[in-house]
Amino acid sequence: MQFPVEIWLRGDNHATTETIAPVARDARVWTDADVVAVLEGMLRALERAKNPDAAADRSVALRGFSWIVSPFESGGVVIALELTLGAVVAGPFDVPESLLTAAIARVIDAQRATTGSIH
């Protein structure tokens, strides 16, 4: 499944658009692994915008950013991530906001549980 991501780098006056395809399935049937792939794809797109030579398979941790699933004006929902580096918004996706919000919370919590805490 291909979808657009809008990327804004902090300090820039404009956003850019890129199309990514991290998963094959439609959003309504995403598994937790698909949700992880979507979030990682969004973070990698943001990294490529800042560092075009960044490795495509660079490891990604699902922490250190704020996120929200929001309704899109023409239907569906978008996923927005914000980091110190900038922000990236993907979608729209035809899936209930509550389901996608729960899936993102679940995969972020699961990764946090496996990586431990840093003090």
Label every PLM stretch briefly.
Residues 1-119:
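Positively charged, low-complexity terminal tracts
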